[in-house]
Amino acid sequence: MNNEKQTIKIASADPSALGLFGLAMVTLVASSQKLGITTGLSFVIPWAVFLGAFAQLFACINDSKHENTFGTTAFGGYAFFWMAVATSWLFKMGVFGKQLAVVDDKQLAFAFLGYLIFSVFMTIGAMETHKVLFVIFVLIDFLFIGLTLSTFGIAEHATHQLAAYSELGIAIFSFYGSAASVLNKHFGRVFLPVGKPFGIFKK
């Protein structure tokens, strides 16, 4: 009797580039609205759903196949964030009726606070990935600080501006991170540097 065990390994590509591209696109479009360059949310919602949510969820699922807990948690956490935010916008716009359009913005502020906590400990993890990702997470921290405070009505104009410019910064660095992930792998060398891990917590 043959007792040999066979292991089948299914290889899949690194999904980080697509996940970061999704993040870059949704934050670029959303920041344009926060900065007052564009108005309304109707054309922000599709990008929130398909790029912010679905693209990052795809990256989350595929990172889990790579046994990448950090990537799975990061992409999954923010994918569900954009799903929830897009749904919240639809409620507020009255898509589901006038009664559901009557909302308490402070509930959303508490959600932003929860995501601020999430982002802070994920920032610690990003320190041991690479420096571009660390910068993205620091900007995400500032985004959620701004969103939390402005939604609570604390120094509303200043904190809204903090959120807006932080979100634009996230878009810029995420485009770079996505490009680096694609091109470095494609060319088999460091085409766009992303910086080494800090080496503080993980030796």
Locate each region found by the language model.
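C-terminal ends of transmembrane helices
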Residues: 56-66, 120-128
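Short, highly charged, low-complexity non-transmembrane loops/tails of multi-pass membrane proteins
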Residues: 188-203
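N-terminal topogenic module of multi-pass integral membrane proteins
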Residues: 1-59, 63, 198-201
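Short juxtamembrane and helix-loop transition motifs at transmembrane-helix boundaries
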Residues: 3-12, 31-42, 68-71, 92-104, ...
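Structural signature of hydrophobic alpha-helical transmembrane segments
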Residues: 40-52, 100-114, 137, 165-168
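Alpha-helical membrane segments in multi-pass integral membrane proteins
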Residues: 109-121, 131-152, 159-180
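Core segments of alpha-helical transmembrane spans in multipass integral membrane proteins
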Residues: 22-29, 46-58, 72-90, 109-121
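Cytoplasmic-side transmembrane-helix entry/capping segments in multi-pass membrane proteins
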Residues: 69-78, 133-138
